[in-house]
Each structure stands twice: as structure tokens, then as C-alpha cells.
Regions:
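FabD-like malonyl-/acyl-CoA
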Residues: 1-141, 188, 192, 269-303, ...
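Alpha/beta catalytic cores of group-transfer enzymes, especially the acyltransferase/condensing modules
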Residues: 10-12, 39-41, 100-252
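Non-catalytic positions within long, well-ordered alpha-helices that form the structural scaffold/packing
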Residues: 77, 182, 263-266
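A short, acidic, amphipathic alpha-helical segment used as a generic capping/interface helix at domain edges
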Residues: 251-267
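Post-His helix in hydrolase/transferase enzymes
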Residues: 307-309
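Long, low-complexity, intrinsically disordered segments
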Residues: 318-328
Length: 328
């Protein structure tokens, strides 16, 4: 079975994330310990003990989600469950790049920590907000944003699936676009609790800083295609992946297009790797017939490996194999 691995972005974080995997599997615990050393503080304690108010800060949320995803991916890889493609939603694109061999994990965890700092500062420099609009076509949301531009900057930021688009921009313009969306028949309009107008021009200073941070690390040619947020195109060359990551903070996450591209290219199953099941839910709005699994904890790992190890030519998940042995 040809698999695509999907890696979640911000919003999925929760106290306890990754703890069960790390307690049971030394390979997962090693990933968290590596992140702690790379960052110079106990990210693992924050993930497992909270408080949630600290974990929700984007400077912590981003490395936390990346670390949980990479820990779960390492266990899948050791069990022989391997993807033909990877994709990640916003921050999750960095996790996808690690799984594809385009980024080294220690570089990636420091990068997303820096990305969080830059995004937070950009939100202070140019305050903004975001909102989810449910029940309208993408073109209708684009029209609402265009009509609201007299109130300021506003644009589609996350094209998540049929009838689900997140907009981003200056507060007055977002409020106006939401009013227009309601008038067009939107089923729901949900203001989001965020520290800035992510994936919009208001992130300009963050994008510039991120370009500098990316210039300091190696972005390798990928071993498997990474489907980029900004283009929904599969990328392999390191120079293309670097450019896509640089463009991502200012551009929309074309998630629906990315999933449709993966299905069209032959993906027969999807595995959400890391915290939560949001991406599986979005996938079901596109195509309920495509099988999917999620690996958040040991139960999800066991179920996924049991279902896929044979199809992927892998080995069963047991406590006897060295990469997967359980901690005492």
C-alpha cells in the first residue's frame, strides 16, 4: 500500500503529548531528550506536565508538536511502516521535512523554536487575528476578503477542505470579512485564539527572520517527495524545499489541494503522525473511502503497525526488536 504521512500543526497541542510513547519506547524518549538538549530547556516537562498556558505559547507549541511527531515517526519507521510521500500542515511541514530527510531533527527543532519567536514578535509589531469560516466555497471566502480590504489586510490563510477556510489579517478587516461571510450564508464563523495573523502579509518581519535562520542550516534533497503547503506540489530538491519553507509564513496553506494531489498521485492510505486527529478529520471531508490511521500514543501505534506493517513490508511491533523495545 502506498502511504502518505501527514504531520499536524498548531492547535493540536495538549498536556501529556508524547508522554506515553516516551515512557514505553526508548527511541521516542531519545527524541524528546535530543530536543531538550538542542533547545537548552526541558521541553519534555512542558509537554508532559504543562502548564497548558505555557504550552500554548507558539515558541513552545511549535517544537513540542515537531518533537512528538518525529518521535512517532521514528517508531513507525523502525517497524517498517514507511511513506511514499509526506505533507505537514503549516508547522507540520517541518516535521514532514525531517521524515523525508530534508532537515536534521536538531536543526528543525531549533528552527521551529526560532519560527515561534519570530511569529510572536511579528504579531506584536503588526497585530492581527484569524477566523475559521465554515460552509462557504473557497471563492466566496476570497470574495468576502476582497470586499473587506477597505478595512485593512485580510486574506485566506488555510484552505483546509470543502467548506472550511481560515482567514487571517488585521482585526478590523477580519471582523468585516466575517460579517460579509455570514451574509453570504456561512454556517459558522469561529474567531481563533492566536497571537498573530499567520500566513498573511502581516508576517513579513517573521518571514525575513526565518529566511536568515534557514540560511544557517542545511536543507538536503529529500528522500521522498514533500508536498509543499504553498503550491500543493511534491518537492524533492533541497533548494525548492527551502524556498517553500521561506514562502510559507506569508502564503496560504493549500491543504485541500495537497490532499487531492496525493490521492491523484496514487496515495492509498494516510497516517497522521503526532498529536491529535485533526488532519484525518479534514481528509474525511474530502474522501471518506480513503483509509487512514493516526499515531498519537502506543495504542494508535500498535493499531497502525498491525494494519500496515505487512502491507508495507515491515515487521510486527514487539518488545523484542531493538528499535522498538519497551522501556522498563
Amino acid at each position: 500500500m502506498k502511504l502518505a504521512f501527514l504531520f499536524p500543526g498548531q492547535g493540536a497541542q495538549a498536556v501529556g503529548m508524547g508522554q506515553a510513547l516516551a515512557e514505553r519506547f526508548p527511541a521516542a524518549r531519545h527524541v524528546f531528550e535530543t530536543a531538550d538538549r538542542a533547545l537548552g530547556y526541558r521541553l519534555s516537562d512542558l509537554c508532559w506536565k504543562g502548564p497548558i498556558e505555557e504550552l500554548r505559547k507558539t515558541v513552545h507549541t511549535q517544537p513540542a508538536l515537531l518533537t512528538h511527531s518525529v518521535a512517532a515517526w521514528k517508531l513507525l519507521d523502525a517497524a517498517g511502516v514507511k511513506p511514499s510521500w509526506v505533507a505537514g500542515h503549516s508547522l507540520g511541514e517541518y516535521s514532514a521535512c525531517v521524515a523525508a530527510g530534508a532537515l536534521d531533527f536538531e536543526d528543525a527543532v531549533r528552527l521551529v523554536h526560532r519560527r515561534g519567536e519570530l511569529m510572536y514578535r511579528a504579531g506584536l509589531d503588526r497585530p492581527g487575528t484569524m477566523a475559521a469560516i465554515l460552509g462557504l466555497e473557497r471563492t466566496q471566502v476570497e470574495e468576502a476578503c476582497a470586499r473587506a480590504e477597505g478595512a485593512g489586510v485580510v486574506c485566506p490563510a488555510n484552505l483546509n477542505g470543502p467548506g472550511q477556510v481560515v482567514i487571517s489579517g488585521e482585526r478590523a478587516a477580519v471582523v468585516r470579512a466575517c460579517e460579509l461571510a455570514r451574509g453570504m450564508g456561512a454556517k459558522r464563523v469561529i474567531p481563533l485564539e492566536v497571537s498573530g495573523a499567520f500566513h498573511s502579509p502581516l508576517m513579513g518581519s517573521a518571514a525575513a527572520g526565518l529566511t536568515e535562520a534557514l540560511a544557517a542550516v542545511s536543507v538536503h534533497d529529500a528522500l521522498i517527495p514533500v508536498v509543499a503547503n504553498v503550491s500543493a506540489e511534491p518537492l524533492r530538491r533541497g533548494v525548492e524545499i527551502r524556498a517553500a519553507l521561506e514562502a510559507q509564513l506569508l502564503g496560504a496553506v493549500r491543504w485541500e489541494d495537497s490532499m487531492r494531489r496525493l490521492i491523484a498521485d496514487g496515495a492509498q492510505g494516510f497516517v497522521e503522525v503526532g498529536t491529535g486527529t485533526v488532519l484525518r478529520g479534514l481528509l474525511r471531508t474530502l474522501d471518506k473511502s480513503v483509509p487512514s490511521w493516526s499515531v498519537d500514543d502506543p495504542d494508535g501505534l500498535q493499531a497502525t503497525v498491525s494494519a500496515l506493517a505487512g502491507a508495507a513490508g515491515g515487521v510486527p511491533l514487539t518488545g523484542d526488536s531493538e528499535p522498538m523495545e519497551e522501556a522498563g
